[in-house]
UniProtKB/Swiss-Prot annotation:
InterPro entries: Ribosomal_bL19 (IPR001857), Ribosomal_bL19_CS (IPR018257), Ribosomal_bL19_sf (IPR038657), Translation_prot_SH3-like_sf (IPR008991). Gene3D superfamilies: 2.30.30.790. GO terms for biological process: translation. This is Large ribosomal subunit protein bL19. GO terms for cellular component: cytosolic large ribosomal subunit. The keyword DNA damage does not apply. PANTHER family: LARGE RIBOSOMAL SUBUNIT PROTEIN BL19M (PTHR15680:SF9), RIBOSOMAL PROTEIN L19 (PTHR15680). GO terms for molecular function: structural constituent of ribosome. It comes from Streptococcus pyogenes serotype M1. It holds the Pfam family Ribosomal_L19. The gene is rplS. Keywords: Ribonucleoprotein, Ribosomal protein. This protein is located at the 30S-50S ribosomal subunit interface and may play a role in the structure and function of the aminoacyl-tRNA binding site. It comes from the Bacteria. The keyword Plastid does not apply.
């Protein structure tokens, strides 16, 4: 990476991000603007992918809401995310869990590991 770009982005990186991987269940506290008010909206689900590096690193969280799968993609170092909580660690053998989109109910469960 260009040293100039690297020096500019180092100040933007957040240090309060917990370690999480695909398969982990996380609770994301996202700031949402509604009119003139700003509030925290909690989005809890399974991390199905994590891609990119540095300031442009992103992760995708999937949850089932009302029987419908909902996915949201967040940048890791965005100020729009207040905090990320890791609820449980899942045991998976893939980096991208896109196959969970086709599974329903008990088939979509991920085994928990103790860390």
């Amino acid at each position: 990476m260009n040293p100039l770009i690297q020096s500019l982005t180092e100040g933007q990186l957040r240090s309060d991000i917990p370690n999480f991987r695909p398969g982990d269940t996380v609770r994301v506290h996202a700031k949402v603007v509604e009119g003139t008010r700003e509030r925290i909206q909690i989005f809890e689900g399974v991390v199905i992918s994590r891609k990119g590096q540095g300031i442009s690193e992103m992760y995708t969280v999937r949850k089932i809401s009302g029987g419908i799968g909902v996915e949201r993609t967040f940048p890791i170092h965005t100020p729009r995310v207040d905090k990320i909580e890791v609820i449980r660690h899942g045991k998976v053998r893939r980096a991208k869990l896109y196959y969970l989109r086709a599974l329903q109910g008990k088939a979509a469960r991920i085994k928990e590991i103790r860390r």
